Amino acid sequence: HPRVRRLRQMCIRDRLIITGGPGTGKTTTINTIIKYFEEKGSEILLAAPTGRAAKRMTEATGHEAKTIHRLLELSGMPSDESTGVNFERNEDNPLEADVVIIDEMSMVDIFLMNSLLKAVVKPTRLILVGDADQLPSVGPGAVLKDIIKADVFNVVRLVKIFRQEEAGDIVTVSYTHLRAHET
């Protein structure tokens, strides 16, 4: 099936954005991606910008999600960057995983994104999920929108709105409603 092939193709990319408005299947797609990588025996890390978003991600996926700060291991050491924060996980001590999935990316500012990119080095896959049309983070930058415009990540836009409770098998729903567009 062509949609199944597209989903597999998107999962082999090392940098991917999944974007769509409310009800378009972002969480369903995350669950499908998790299942795909679990079947391959991959180590998967999940995170979101806030404790509340991480808790929702944990509930929706059945897998532990952390805040990005916790994932990157916020350090008590002072930082020489303008952010005033320092993380244990960085280019010298990268995250140890095959796949890192970050949800609610519209809430991430440029400083946190910079730290995240330093800690996720190839061959680790980085999958960013969020609604590019949401209001940007309270910190500087509209990171998700800017990355999409910069054309440095592959982008999947989920456009069809559906109700999850009407969905049968979660994988079937993702395959059916996924429209991949590389920008």
Predicted regions and their residues:
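Conserved P-loop NTPase motor core of helicases/translocases
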Residues: 43-48, 52-119, 160-161, 170-171
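Hydrophobic positions on the alpha1 helix immediately C-terminal to the Walker A/P-loop
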Residues: 29
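Hydrophobic anchor at the beta1->P-loop junction of P-loop NTPases
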Residues: 18
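Loop/turn-to-beta-strand initiation segments
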Residues: 98, 123-127
